[in-house]
Each structure stands twice: as C-alpha cells, then as structure tokens.
C-alpha cells in the first residue's frame, strides 16, 4: 500500500479523496494554482505544492508540473479525480515512465474508451447495444448535414474527445446541424484540444442511465448497480439518483453484464462508468465509457456501502477486489443535487464572487435518512472564473425514493449561500415537482417543464401557509428583540397575549392571530386552524429552522426594509407583517412598475468574447445569434430578443468583459 499520494485536482473532489486517504492512513499532497492558494483542499492535505498561474492550462493541466510535485514530496501515486487530466492517456504513461503509480485505469483502456468513435466500435465488437450513427470523423458542416439527413432527425453532434456536456448539440434541422457543428467543434477544441466531432441518432424522450464498474489488475470486473442522471441541462447533469426508478432487476442485470463485458474487452482495471441512453420501454444503447471516477459517485456509495475511492487506491496498489458480484447488494435510495454558482433566473449563467455566507446543512443521520455534503469551499472563499462553477454535491439517502427526495428537499431549504448567485432555488423547485417525484423522467425534463427558463414560483397552498406562519413567528421574535433593546420592562403576563396580524405574502393577505407561549407561539388562521410554531431561530441567521404544526421545516430568510424575503421548497416571496390597520393602509399604497429598455445587449456574466456574429447596420430577427461569450469552459450564444437594427458594437473578439458590460446597441 502507498504511504503518500498526490491529488492532481482541486475543489470538492480533491477534498473527497483526501478524506478517504486520511482514513486509510495515507498521507496526501495537494497541488494548487495562484487562484487556489487559500483553497480548502490545500489546507486539508498534509503537504501542498504550488504549480502555477490560475488558468488550468498553465497549472493543473501541465503533466510535468504534477510529476515534479511528486518528486519534490515523494508521492508514490497520483489520483486524478475527475476532469482535468483524469482521461488523458498521456498522463498515466508519463507517470509510469517516472516510476509513479496512476490511481486509475491503464493507458490502453483510456485510449480505447476515450475516443468516442473508437469506443462505439469496441462496444459493438463486445456485443453491447449501440445507437445508430456515423462513426467517422466529420470535416465540414455540409458533410454533417448530409449525414444527419441520412440518419434522420433529430441527431446529436458530439465531440469525439468530449465529456461533461461540452462539445454536444442536439439538432432538429439542417440549419441547426450547421450551427451545432461549428459550436461543438469550437468547444471541443478549446476544452479538449481535439476538434473531431461525429453524428449519431438522438433517441427521442430518452433517459440517461449509467452503470458503475470496478476492476482490478487480476482480471476481475464487477458492476455496482446503476445511476439515473436524466435531469440534465445543456447535457450537464443536475440531479442524479441510485437506483433508477425505471429499471427492473432483469434490465439492471442485462445492462450490468454488458458493461462488464465491455470493461473486460479493454482490460479495465479501476473504477469506471458505462453510460447508456434508455427508452421508456427499457431498451438501452451504449453512449460512452468514462474512464474515471464520476462526479455523481456518492449515490452509488450510499446504496452499496462501498468507498469507491478506497477501492481505486487498493486496486492501483495491486490488491484484488475484496468482493464478488454476488456480494453487491443495493440498499435504499440516494439522491444527489449539484449545487452550482450560477443564476437560474438568467438562463443559468455562471456567477463569481466571494461566499459571504456558506452554511450547508448538518451532515449525518436525519431521522431514518442520512445527509452528506461533498464540497471544496468555505465561507469567505472565492468562486473564480477559471474553473468549474460547482460549489457542492448535496446527497441524501433514505430507505425509499420518496423519503430520500423529502430529505433532499429539507437539506436544500437549510443550505444557506450568499455573496453569489446559485441554483439552490431551482434544485428545491425540482424536488417539489410532481413529475420528478413520480419518476416520470427524460433528459428533456428541464426543457419541457421550464421552457421559458426558471423563475422561483410564488408560494401556494401548504407551502404558502408554512411561509406565512414562519413570517408571523419571525415578526414576533423581532418585536421581542426590540422590546428588549428599548429597555422597557416586560411583564411576565406579556408571554400570554393575543395579537391580530395580517401577513402580506407575495401580494396575498393571510389574517392570523398570534398567541405567545413560553416555548412556542400559536398561529391561528382565519378559518380557525391553529398551528403551533416552535423555533430557536435568532435574528440575523440565514435559515429559520423549526416545526410548524408538528412538521420540521427549514426556510431561507433575508432581511428587507420592513419585512423579510423567504425561500422554501423552491418558492420565493417577500413577507411583511402588519397590524390590521397597517394592512388596510398598505393596500392603498401605489406600486411603481419598472420599465426596461431592451436597446442594449449586455454581457450576462464575466467572460471572454469568442466572436461577434453581426456588424453595425445589420438588421437582425428575433432569435438570431449576435455574439458568443465563453465563461467557465462553456460557450454561451447571445441572441436577439426582438427584431432590430444594430446601431453600434462596443466589444470585439478576445475582449474580457465584466458582467453587464455593453456588447452592442440597437437603434
């Protein structure tokens, strides 16, 4: 076994690997760029080595710097995590030449599966079900259109060396193929240094299901069940779960056996994932094999009780797998939400800045459930433009799928982040969505259910009642505090007074009567329903946690002038609590609407201008591409929101722009 390993990665996955190594008694070495000098993974490791400037191409992606760090610290092995160098065949070869062990698959397996075109040929040879498509390299948009016409629409344009949703486009017409080919090729070149793309049939209404495999250097390979990753946006996974609500045991076994057959065909000897696209009828086709640890591996760990990082380390050290296929048992259900620094109300554009508040939910048992939070940030830390915008992976386990979803919903409500925009409101809304809860999924779920993008819905029904009750409790607590600060003497009898109040929540009035008690308050609604509300919340805390009518509830709280902003179960609203007379007067106050101009196209996030697609004087139609801005390794096409004439262009290709910088103006 190794005495010391180096983690050639950053962020949450580096922290995740360090935790397992520490438990195994193995010392760890972190590497870091200028931007990560104060990062959590650097502080967690036993040693840390600086490897260069912030851009990954000058630090984390430079193989020679990783090898030098190993020599400097005496690290015997390297775990690549995911992304970065994890699937580059040259990396394990260079490590081997330096006498350093790679904690991952052998270079031959990476080469065989890393090329999407060659991997499909290998899968077909191993009798794995494959999607119809053209497995040659496509050289031009015209050739792509010809092939797409032959295959039949819709088609998927994919980077041969791609992954993580980059270099992928769905096209429903020849025009979309031509544009998608250019975008996919550009992203593939910038992300992977390989601009080859291919075209395959896109399965309508598909589900994304993947099989986790693990092999050793003695020819043993097993599968550890499946994960469903159908909730995606721009081909990037958002929510994952294990097992899949679609599969029965027979289909699970069939998919697992095909995954093992493919792994054995390429002598696979580490953790890897075989991805399939599945139809609603349980038919399935091979997509690709990821020759690394997946982002979503925790859900597999939660239902199997296995530590995949530990297994990777042990098989890399030459040990045999400690279990056979018959030993693998799936227990309960796990759900993972990817918490990203992105604004769901602005088409999920990346957000950067300092985490002025970062308070994740408490990890560990929660009744019959378990909460786990894999993260690599802390309060006061910086989310930089140079890297992936992931903040954390929030995982919950419970005996049943619905219980795991309920636990996830509570954990998201209790997850407080401020200083940047984030997608927790969107994730919470997904947890409450009936279609998700029913397991009626497809990779088009988000596009179908949120066609106009995401706006946090106003609270209704039971959610609104809970938020109104919490607002009344918060108002009561704030008034108690004011009385204490003012120095007024409080008669003990004041603990038992009644007060009529009106909670104004999202434009609706909720008349209530608030009765104070020693350890709780009683909120009585207009229909006579009484809810006991108990909480230890203190003014200034970002999350109100307590019980409302006996139900455990967490609600995000932000102070406003004369009120609070509340967020719960994906819904958001401002709440103000009035006396009856104040409510009558407030109803008479005019509300001023803000007008928007729409005459400028602004940069939606800090980024690099990849191209300007129009010229001054050009007449553009609604939906026409205007510019391409790259941020956090993704290209974002900015389109005209209306028919207009371009009067002035302020930016040019290569410009680095701040958020809301003017790119162009309309007449």
Predicted features along the sequence, with ranges:
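Structured functional modules or segments
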Residues: 592-667
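Conserved nucleotide-binding/hydrolysis modules and their immediate coupling elements
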Residues: 307, 516-522, 526-543, 547-554, ...
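Short, well-ordered beta-strand elements within core beta-sheets of diverse protein domains
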Residues: 168-170, 201, 247, 390-399, ...
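Structured, non-catalytic alpha/beta "coupling" segments that mediate domain-domain communication
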Residues: 87-94, 336, 346, 549-580
